[in-house]
């Protein structure tokens, strides 16, 4: 498994000499292994992700705040009609996920209606996706403490485990659940 952090900032992207070491982009993490390219959130770092036409690309959203979805439409790879991109969130069902993306990237807020223009964006239920790919990897989620809700993800294949816990207002009562969830990562 190879994890690339394309963005780790919260709220707004920033570009200053102080952010050179870790970057100034908002949330976007790319995990590559086997036939898969998993992307966690599409903050401003998503514009730097090279979508791999030879891998199954799945975008998982931790939650729907602006800094976690704002660059979905700014990665030219999503406009390749031959490249299916699966979108899922353990936070809600596929209908609500599509509705949120549709609202965010449509007329009133954005110049194109992304979900209508791009038929290659495939919204899928988290549980269905989990079943479809269980022979290759196991993905779990954990509810986190964040306004509006948020989830963390744990991905495990035959060799490795990576846990991605993004926005969370830590409460000491979470310690054992977080420890168990992230164990052996």
Where are these regions (language model features)?
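Binuclear metal-dependent hydrolase catalytic cores
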Residues: 1-163, 170-176, 180-183
């Amino acid at each position: 498994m190879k994890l690339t952090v394309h963005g780790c900032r919260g709220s707004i992207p920033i570009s200053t000499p102080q952010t050179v070491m870790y970057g100034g982009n908002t949330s976007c993490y790319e995990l590559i292994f086997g036939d898969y390219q998993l992307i966690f959130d599409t903050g401003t770092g998503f514009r730097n992700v090279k979508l791999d036409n030879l891998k199954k690309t799945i975008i998982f959203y931790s939650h729907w705040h602006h800094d976690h979805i704002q660059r979905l439409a700014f990665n030219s790879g999503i406009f390749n009609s031959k490249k299916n991109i699966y979108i899922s969130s353990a936070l809600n069902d596929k209908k609500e996920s599509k509705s949120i993306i549709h609202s965010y990237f449509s007329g009133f807020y954005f110049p194109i209606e992304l979900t209508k223009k791009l038929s290659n964006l495939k919204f899928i239920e988290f549980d269905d996706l989990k079943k479809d790919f269980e022979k290759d990897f196991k993905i779990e989620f954990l509810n986190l403490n964040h306004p509006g809700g948020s989830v963390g993800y744990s991905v495990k294949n035959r060799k490795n485990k990576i846990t991605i816990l993004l926005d969370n207002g830590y409460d000491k009562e979470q310690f054992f659940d977080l420890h168990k969830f992230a164990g052996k990562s």
